[in-house]
């Protein structure tokens, strides 16, 4: 799996079909930046991966809390 594949898979898992804008907001980057990564116009910076892991952890915690309330 390439880095772009990983980014797409995680973006979709976190935010659904329209994942690019919400992911960009969470990372504090422009939507265009995410699109450039996907097109391989610019490399995905190494610091993005730990930031994505932290975003996934926060969203997982929110989901678990919501699930527990059911």
Model-assigned labels for residue ranges:
Residues 9-10, 14, 21, 38, ...:
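Residue-level detection of beta-strand scaffold positions
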């Amino acid at each position: 799996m390439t880095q772009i594949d990983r980014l797409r898979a995680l973006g979709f898992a976190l935010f659904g079909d329209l994942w690019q804008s919400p992911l960009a907001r969470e990372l504090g980057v422009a939507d265009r930046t995410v699109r450039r990564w996907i097109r391989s116009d610019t490399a995905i910076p190494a610091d993005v991966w730990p930031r994505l892991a932290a975003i996934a952890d926060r969203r997982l915690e929110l989901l678990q809390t919501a699930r527990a309330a059911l």
